[in-house]
Amino acid sequence: MPQLDTSTWFITILSMLMTLFILFQLKLSKHIYYPTPEPKFSKTHKQNTPWETKWKKIYLPLLLPQQ
């Protein structure tokens, strides 16, 4: 049974790792980083539901008896 020649494995693995590293660096360098998102302020209009407009009343506080 012939022996497996492993003399070139080191160079093959090393070149593969270097290639992966370079490709990953190129991919990261072309990535666009967006600025930090900020909340968008917009006018919010509260819409009253029909039951809110129908039953909305302003109650005065109870009058205290005069002393």
Curated annotation (Swiss-Prot):
Belongs to the ATPase protein 8 family. The modification N6-succinyllysine is found at residue 54. The keyword Ion transport applies. One of its GO terms (cellular component) is mitochondrial membrane. F-type ATPases have 2 components, CF(1) - the catalytic core - and CF(0) - the membrane proton channel. Component of an ATP synthase complex composed of ATP5PB, ATP5MC1, ATP5F1E, ATP5PD, ATP5ME, ATP5PF, ATP5MF, MT-ATP6, MT-ATP8, ATP5F1A, ATP5F1B, ATP5F1D, ATP5F1C, ATP5PO, ATP5MG, ATP5MK and ATP5MJ. Interacts with PRICKLE3. It is a single-pass membrane protein. The keyword Chloroplast does not apply. One of its GO terms (molecular function) is proton transmembrane transporter activity. Its main location: mitochondrion. Mitochondrial membrane ATP synthase (F(1)F(0) ATP synthase or Complex V) produces ATP from ADP in the presence of a proton gradient across the membrane which is generated by electron transport complexes of the respiratory chain. F-type ATPases consist of two structural domains, F(1) - containing the extramembraneous catalytic core and F(0) - containing the membrane proton channel, linked together by a central stalk and a peripheral stalk. During catalysis, ATP synthesis in the catalytic domain of F(1) is coupled via a rotary mechanism of the central stalk subunits to proton translocation. The chain crosses the membrane at residues 8-24. Pfam families: ATP-synt_8. Keywords: Acetylation, ATP synthesis, CF(0), Hydrogen ion transport, Ion transport, Membrane, Mitochondrion, Transmembrane, Transmembrane helix, Transport. It is found in: Mitochondrion membrane. It comes from the Eukaryota. The modification N6-acetyllysine is found at residues 54, 57. InterPro entries: ATP8_mammal (IPR039017), ATP8_metazoa (IPR001421). One of its GO terms (biological process) is proton motive force-driven ATP synthesis. Disulfide bonds: none annotated. This is ATP synthase protein 8.
